[in-house]
């Protein structure tokens, strides 16, 4: 079936009809003495449409089996010719059948060389399309140039297209190279900036902490400077002698703001020792509403209160001694820091207490009521136990006074009782807040005059044994003395 198709196809193509047998002739190429006839095949990688088939193509064979084929192109294509280059190889067993239409003879020829060419400007790998090019002898040379021309024409047309494409590719490659060149400078600054960026990153943390440090140095001092300004304002108000500002600073310090106002007020009070007693009395008289704030302050500073309880008792005794002495003598305000004045006030307080106890003991012994006698005995017994050896000579001298001096001594005792009756006007609750407001000042004074306070403590233990031996609060002792004085005053009235 396939053979019949091929035969029919061949007969149709060669215009050979019938089933007749035809003779096959061998060509001159089979003759070993032939040197003039040779058949070659040229294979092109493509066949351009712009090849001019009416003109002849040229084949040049150079050294090292190099072959150059030049094919003319049409004038309308714009490209004069297309050039192919390649190499040739010898055939060994390939043959070619040549059919002559005029005579009807069929000739078998041997192929000599196989030439494979490709377009010079294109560097594409050679992919030749098998193409049988018949090279007839000199007499049949017409078909060879025609076939060659056809092949070369196709090659020429391909050259035109490839030249256009190559020109375009040149432009494209040039643009790509330009882009690459453009990319390199773009990348080069990026590469240059990449090392610079880490440097900037290394610098940025260094600059950032410096900036924060500068801000910290700017902001941190600003807050205490503002507070210092306020404190200087408070100290200036205290220096001018404004009693309202003094009480306000004491209330502010007792309400939980003892940081700066108390410190500066303490310094100001140290600077002005003459008006210390008057201002202290005024703050004590105007400070009964401060008891609630004083309780709050005790709740806040309960830890420090247990450690400083004994010092508070001794300093309150000094304040009370100064108050009683100032009310008794109506003299100028005194400085609590002077050691001589403390000794005098302690001695006078001890003498007054001794005289008062003597009088109370004498009057209570003369009373007839059993209840009053029992209470007087218990009070006198406790007071006699608490008294020191320094007070006993005073009792002895007071008991041995001559009769001529009894009225004068009785008059002095009566004045002392009147002054002791005036003590409740000081309001016992106001003593502790006043001390609380000056608590920080006295702590600073204690730090500077620690040795001086030790001497005062020894003197207090020696001279006022009543308060030193008793470990309780001074307010209870003061109330006990006031009760005794009130009982004695009732006896005098009777």
From Swiss-Prot:
Residues 119-212, 243-494 are annotated as: Disordered. The keyword Transcription applies. Residues 139-156, 307-319, 344-373, 414-424, 455-464, 475-488 have a biased composition (Low complexity). GO terms for biological process: cellular response to heat; positive regulation of DNA-templated transcription; transcription elongation by RNA polymerase II. It comes from the Eukaryota. InterPro entries: EAF_fam, Tscrpt_elong_fac_Eaf_N. Signal peptide: none annotated. Residues 119-138, 159-178, 243-256, 280-306, 320-332 have a biased composition (Polar residues). The keyword Phosphoprotein applies. Belongs to the EAF family. Promotes transcriptional elongation by Su(Tpl)/ELL. Essential for development. This is Ell-associated factor Eaf. It comes from Drosophila virilis (Fruit fly).
């Amino acid at each position: 079936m396939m053979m019949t198709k091929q035969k029919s196809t061949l007969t149709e193509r060669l215009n050979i009809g019938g089933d007749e047998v035809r003779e096959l002739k061998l060509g001159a190429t089979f003759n070993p003495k032939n040197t003039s006839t040779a058949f070659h095949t040229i294979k092109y990688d493509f066949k351009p449409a712009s090849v001019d088939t009416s003109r002849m193509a040229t084949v040049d064979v150079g050294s090292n089996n190099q072959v150059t084929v030049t094919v003319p192109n049409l004038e309308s294509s714009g490209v004069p010719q297309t050039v192919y280059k390649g190499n040739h190889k010898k055939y060994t067993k390939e043959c070619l059948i040549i059919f002559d239409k005029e005579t009807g003879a069929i000739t078998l020829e041997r192929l000599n060389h196989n030439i494979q060419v490709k377009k010079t400007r294109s560097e594409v790998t050679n992919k030749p399309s098998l193409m049988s090019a018949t090279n007839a002898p000199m007499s049949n040379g017409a078909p060879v140039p025609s076939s060659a021309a056809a092949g070369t024409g196709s090659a020429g047309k391909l050259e035109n297209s490839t030249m256009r494409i190559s020109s375009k590719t040149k432009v494209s490659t040039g643009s790509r190279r330009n882009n690459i060149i453009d990319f390199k400078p773009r990348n080069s600054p990026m590469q240059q900036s990449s090392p610079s960026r880490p440097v900037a990153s290394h610098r940025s943390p260094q600059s950032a902490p410096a900036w924060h440090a500068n801000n910290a140095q700017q902001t941190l001092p600003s807050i205490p400077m503002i507070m210092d300004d306020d404190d200087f304002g408070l100290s200036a108000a205290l220096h001018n002698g404004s009693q309202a500002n003094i009480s306000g600073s004491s209330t502010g310090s007792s309400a939980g703001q003892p940081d700066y106002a108390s410190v500066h007020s303490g310094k100001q009070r140290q600077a002005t020792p003459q008006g210390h007693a008057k201002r202290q009395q005024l703050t004590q008289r105007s400070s009964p509403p401060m008891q609630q704030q004083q309780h709050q302050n005790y709740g806040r500073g309960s830890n420090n209160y247990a450690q400083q309880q004994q010092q508070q008792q001794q300093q309150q005794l000094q304040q009370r001694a100064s108050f009683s002495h100032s009310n008794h003598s109506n003299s100028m305000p005194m400085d609590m820091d002077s050691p001589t004045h403390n000794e005098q006030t302690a001695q006078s307080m001890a003498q007054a207490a001794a005289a008062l106890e003597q009088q109370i003991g004498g009057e209570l012994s003369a009373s007839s009521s059993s209840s009053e006698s029992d209470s007087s005995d218990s009070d006198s017994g406790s007071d006699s136990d608490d008294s020191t050896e320094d007070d006993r000579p005073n009792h002895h001298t007071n008991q041995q006074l001559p009769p001529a001096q009894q009225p004068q001594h009785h008059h002095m005792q009566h004045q002392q009782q009147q002054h002791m009756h005036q003590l409740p006007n000081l309001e016992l609750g106001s003593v502790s807040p006043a001390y609380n407001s000056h608590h920080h000042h006295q702590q600073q004074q204690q730090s500077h005059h620690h040795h001086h306070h030790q001497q005062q403590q020894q003197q207090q233990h020696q001279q006022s044994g009543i308060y030193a031996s008793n470990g309780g609060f001074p307010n209870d002792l003061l109330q006990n003395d006031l009760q005794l004085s009130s009982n004695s005053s009732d006896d005098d009235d009777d």
